[in-house]
């Protein structure tokens, strides 16, 4: 039964064809028929080899229409900065006590922020937070004195991205319940951020392939130029 359902969902999607962005979004939304609000994800295959330091792609982007998901934020801070984080809506705020909780394997948050003075302490959590992509980093604005701004950005649609070993960068950019225009704006914002993060060591064609999909639906390949405005060299 599940196989027939999958076959029906996949009907009309040509895996060899590149679709215009607006058409691809419509196709993905039509096929997001699960009983929950499926996440829409975009993936970009880049012409980089992240094994080389000068070809790493990493950054953060504030999606104009948010992600549609509730983001739980933890902040490592003391004193006035801890109070600032709480006032901004942080879900968990602490210092040594929060380190102990995380070391004990209790990670009840999706994003982690720290003030610079807390990093020697937070550094102990590298083996726990690093593999999960949660380690605070000044390059993506999660090591900062502006904890209120970072908390609000995290809860308002900030998405971190980092290229994987195969040269792929991907992110959830909304929900199937979003209208097509909102999804298109989010996808373009994400693509723009990835292009701006193009490393100096990247040679040749930078954006090789782009595709979008829903949680349970098929991937729909997109003409890169319809996302980037022009083929990225």
From Swiss-Prot:
Q: One biological-process term from Gene Ontology?
A: translation
UniProt keyword annotation of rRNA-binding present: yes
Note the Pfam families from the entry.
Ribosomal_L1
Q: Which domain of life is it from?
A: Bacteria
InterPro entries linked to this entry: Ribosom_uL1_bac-type, Ribosomal_uL1, Ribosomal_uL1-like, Ribosomal_uL1/biogenesis, Ribosomal_uL1_3-a/b-sand, Ribosomal_uL1_CS
Q: Which UniProt keywords apply?
A: Repressor, Ribonucleoprotein, Ribosomal protein, RNA-binding, rRNA-binding, Translation regulation, tRNA-binding
Q: Does the keyword GTP-binding apply?
A: no
Task: Indicate the family of this protein.
Answer: Belongs to the universal ribosomal protein uL1 family.
Described function: Binds directly to 23S rRNA. The L1 stalk is quite mobile in the ribosome, and is involved in E site tRNA release.
How this chain assembles, per its entry, is: Part of the 50S ribosomal subunit.
- Name of the protein: Large ribosomal subunit protein uL1
């Amino acid at each position: 039964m599940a196989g027939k359902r999958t076959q029906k969902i996949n009907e009309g999607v040509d895996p060899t064809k590149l679709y215009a962005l607006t058409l691809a979004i419509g196709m993905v939304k039509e096929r997001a028929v699960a009983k929950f609000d499926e996440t829409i994800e975009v993936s970009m295959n880049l012409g980089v080899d992240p094994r080389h330091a000068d070809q790493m792609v990493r950054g953060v982007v504030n999606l104009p229409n948010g992600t549609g998901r509730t983001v739980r934020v933890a902040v490592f801070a003391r004193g006035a900065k801890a109070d600032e984080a709480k006032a901004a809506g942080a879900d968990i705020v602490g210092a040594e006590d929060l380190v102990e909780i995380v070391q004990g394997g209790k990670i009840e948050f999706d994003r982690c922020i720290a003030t610079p003075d807390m990093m020697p302490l937070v550094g102990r959590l590298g083996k726990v937070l690093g593999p999960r992509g949660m380690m605070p980093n000044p390059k993506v604005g999660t090591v900062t004195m502006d904890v209120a701004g970072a908390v609000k950005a995290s809860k308002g649609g900030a998405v971190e991205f980092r290229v994987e070993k195969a040269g792929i960068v991907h992110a959830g950019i909304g929900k199937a319940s979003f209208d097509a225009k909102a999804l298109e704006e989010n996808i373009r914002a994400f693509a723009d951020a990835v292009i701006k993060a193009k490393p100096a060591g990247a040679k040749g064609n930078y954006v090789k392939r782009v595709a979008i999909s829903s949680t349970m639906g098929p991937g729909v390949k997109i003409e890169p130029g319809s996302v980037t405005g022009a083929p990225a060299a």
